Amino acid sequence: MTARLALLASLLLLLQLVPPSSAVVLELHGNVYPIGHFFVTMNIGDPAKPYFLDIDTGSTLTWLQCDYPCINCNKVPHGLYKPELKYAVKCTEQRCADLYADLRKPMKCGPKNQCHYGIQYVGGSSIGVLIVDSFSLPASNGTNPTSIAFGCGYNQGKNNHNVPTPVNGILGLGRGKVTLLSQLKSQGVITKHVLGHCISSKGKGFLFFGDAKVPTSGVTWSPMNREHKHYSPRQGTLQFNSNSKPISAAPMEVIFDSGATYTYFALQPYHATLSVVKSTLSKECKFLTEVKEKDRALTVCWKGKDKIRTIDEVKKCFRSLSLKFADGDKKATLEIPPEHYLIISQEGHVCLGILDGSKEHPSLAGTNLIGGITMLDQMVIYDSERSLLGWVNYQCDRIPRSASAITSRL
């Protein structure tokens, strides 16, 4: 009896020593088209105010448009964030050094020794100052205010400032020291550097931090390139309609970027994809004819005899693509069915949601981005603890029951 009690006491002590896994789960809104954003509502400040932030695994810094005062800003939901200048990060602080390390730029101090920065994006740029304020994350007892460093963007470039934007800023979920995930882990809010998102084609979804929501089975895993600054698996080959011969001339370096609405291929794989798609249509679906779309972002579209309302109406005319990532003798396959690369436009046309990156921006030349359209109806997991990328088909419009709480499990 004494031995059993001693064993039980040892087990209880062990359970106390093992840190629990945890997860913060947030509801997602938006769609690929026509909104072009997937965003969460983040409550920031004291008192907390809601702001819509675009989830972006391709960016490290979280930032929102703010009245610093603002030089160039869009019309945003909930208005501009108004910072308290006493919360501005100084150039001498480690947070500023971490920011510039993530940006891979030499540090430049701004006025009053404040940590100013400039970020270039494919669709524009943002200049701002690093701020610290409270993020009220969902918790079982209401909210859990957490002090987070983020960007106060007061000058947005290359944007039409007269056109409202559906989001206030960006939730930086990339690989770096100033990412929201890194800060949450360093403060003990989560115990594992793991995040995942699940974007529904029905316009809903969820985002989670920590590993408590990762499925225990069924996930396809691929090792991440440890040397890459973005979430990138090993090089992959592109195949069409399950053919054994790849249509990509060489292995493709691929980046998973939830901040990209569409998927972007480098010049050769893009033209190879376009060629096989057009060839299939010319043989099997001649009723679809190529047409110029009013939306300039959609560069290749087809019209039918009548307006096309759903992808199901034309799905039989298209074939699946697949990306196969090699890991020694093993291969991890990302299936890309037609509904994960096609869009029905407001004109009632079916359009290719894979774009030529070299035409969009010089920085995308030679780059292959897996964007939101190709991640639909899948849970995509970024496990920096094990340096793995994972994906599994999932019913993303069903938010986990614990979506309003921070949950824990051993």
Curated annotation (Swiss-Prot):
Q: Which EC number applies?
A: 3.4.23.-
Q: Which Pfam families match?
A: TAXi_C, TAXi_N
Q: Which CDD domains match?
A: nucellin_like
Instruction: Please indicate which superkingdom the organism of origin belongs to.
Output: Eukaryota
Catalytic residue list: D56, D257
Q: Which GO terms describe its biological process?
A: proteolysis
Query: Which regions span the lipid bilayer?
Result: none
Instruction: Supply the alphabetized keyword list.
Output: Aspartyl protease, Hydrolase, Protease, Repeat, Signal
> Matching PROSITE patterns, A to Z?
ASP_PROTEASE, PEPTIDASE_A1
Propeptide residues are: 24-46
Q: What does this protein do?
A: Possesses protease activity in vitro.
Protein name (Swiss-Prot/TrEMBL): Aspartic proteinase Asp1
Give the species this sequence originates from.
Oryza sativa subsp. indica (Rice)
Q: Which gene is this protein's source?
A: ASP1
